[in-house]
Amino acid sequence: MKSQWKKLGLAGMAGVLALSAQLAGAKELTVGYVAAGMQYPFNVAAARGFEAAAKEAGVKAVVLDAKTSVERQGNAVDDLIAQKVDGIAVLPIDAVVAQSWVDRAAARNIPVVAVATQIGDPQKHSIKDVYPKLAGLVASDEVRAGADAAQIAARLLPKDRVAKIAIVEGAPGYPTVWQATKGFKDGLEKAGIKYQIVASQPTDWTPEQGESVCQNILTAHPDVDLFYNQADDMVIGCARAVRAAGSHAKLVSRGGSKLGINAVKTGDVDGTVCIQPGKMGRLAFKTLYAAITNPGAPKGKFVDVDTPQVTKTSLSACVPEW
């Protein structure tokens, strides 16, 4: 009997030693996150969500800031590849250029997850048609978000004549700009709204540019009925321009930021669509971690983050994350 216990004890000890050796030899995972520009609250929220999820999982996260430079973002991805990180998440500035970065990482068996923005030409591929070399894409369907904004707008626009609409775009190069515009127009047509786009101008995603663009549009088209801003930051500036001009133009936006939700609450903005960058960041890490720990998992996964509409009567639909 003693001999049997001794054998069991030795076997147990051997198991413990084997497990200890395995743990000692286990590699600490390191993942990289490349932001488009940390001067934007949206980007900060997405990066923080990613970092928080990585910390909870005991994974080291390296966050790099491209400062809105496509070249700098590409170099950051290349640096992470050279460092042989276990995985990379990126919020791409230029969706088409970013395709080559994903190709280079895939050639070295480093999984990549795109955050908020698809990889590839949005005019040739729907957002759900995920670039096959990506481990996954975590984003909101921006065409749907544009249609959500159109539903809000349709309730505000005149029905007895052609409505005059101006679009305040985001920065050139972002696929979101084209997707949000397409969704908005499709949504208006589905609602049976007769409309004319009297102006559509790009910005740099800032309140200052939003105000400047709206001032210029109001000068050229003082009778504009509605401004569709493609981010809450711009709509804050646009609201200032509308008030200063004494205009009665309605304001619809996209974002769900703290500033945007508060502007809806106070009545300065008529409605917005809730985008959740923090949630995207957290889900991006989860998707990347799954790809790292299960290399055989299917690639090209689309993780859709919903986009609830927010008006004065539905403020609780969105918890601001940026």
Spans of model-derived segments:
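Bacterial N-terminal signal peptides that target proteins for export
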Residues: 1-12
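Sec/Tat signal peptide C-region and signal peptidase I cleavage site
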Residues: 19-26
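Extracytoplasmic "Venus flytrap"
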Residues: 30-57, 62-79, 83-85, 90-95, ...
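Short, solvent-exposed amphipathic alpha-helices that sit
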Residues: 42-57, 145-149, 175-194, 209, ...
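Hydrophobic alpha-helical segments within soluble ligand-binding/sensing domains
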Residues: 73, 135-163, 210, 256-260, ...
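Hydrophobic alpha-helical
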Residues: 93-107, 183-184, 198-262
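Flexible loop/hinge segments that line or gate small-molecule binding clefts
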Residues: 101-144, 164, 257-265, 269-270
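Hinge/cleft segment of the Venus flytrap/periplasmic-binding protein
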Residues: 124, 168, 172, 191, ...
